[in-house]
């Protein structure tokens, strides 16, 4: 019996793979790996697809030095800078996305964390939006304290986003102004506040496949509900502007392995999808059951109507 069949049976029986077992799958062919990951997804998660959109609620002037990010004040990019968007702009965007058939809507803000006044402002916005429509609210506001995370929860936010970005051992190569443990503490505080967790990372930063596997196992230990996987889109002016873009085969292999490691979570194809020739269709057949639609924070994405059509054609329920 091949490893891929053996480990598929183990997962479908309710057991989790060890890191050593996952590493054995690295030698498997991509076609078989992707197809089996999709079988695991269908058996354990069904065909329901989770579609979300984001809005850049505060842009630029970030004091952190994440090497991939156009919003960092350390780098000379052409990013448009602004403070917290007006409440009406956020609410109208949420309603518009709900009417398009999107399930979740997240406000994402630049910076290490919001200050008290900014949290107050956004909590009022979340409360208003919750009253108007039933789109599920997510938030991504950096390394917030427990008290602020609880306020978000009380305002109608159901899920908090904070990416690990990469493995603990590789993180220092990407950012030095905050630590991996800072991120983990924020995630734990968000869970304590009663929020679901959306946490994943970026692939193509220069990390190895082993780094990606390590990150996935850390996410499993943290019991996150959603794992967004971004493909690096190198941005001019950042230290990674000349980073080579991953091959499509490497992307498919990574997402498929994530399904073997995280058999029951929402694995979400996120930023960088517009770089792919088929807009991510093959990846969506490799164990994925979620995606971010529309534009990203500082790069263009894919129209939601186009996404929904493609997702339905693949047999998913949206």
Curated annotation (Swiss-Prot):
GO terms for molecular function: 2 iron, 2 sulfur cluster binding; 4 iron, 4 sulfur cluster binding; biotin synthase activity; iron ion binding. It is an enzyme of class 2 (transferase). [4Fe-4S] cluster binds at residues 62, 66, 69. Keywords: 2Fe-2S, 4Fe-4S, Biotin biosynthesis, Iron, Iron-sulfur, Metal-binding, S-adenosyl-L-methionine, Transferase. Its EC number is 2.8.1.6. Catalyzes the conversion of dethiobiotin (DTB) to biotin by the insertion of a sulfur atom into dethiobiotin via a radical-based mechanism. This is Biotin synthase. It comes from Clostridium botulinum (strain Loch Maree / Type A3).
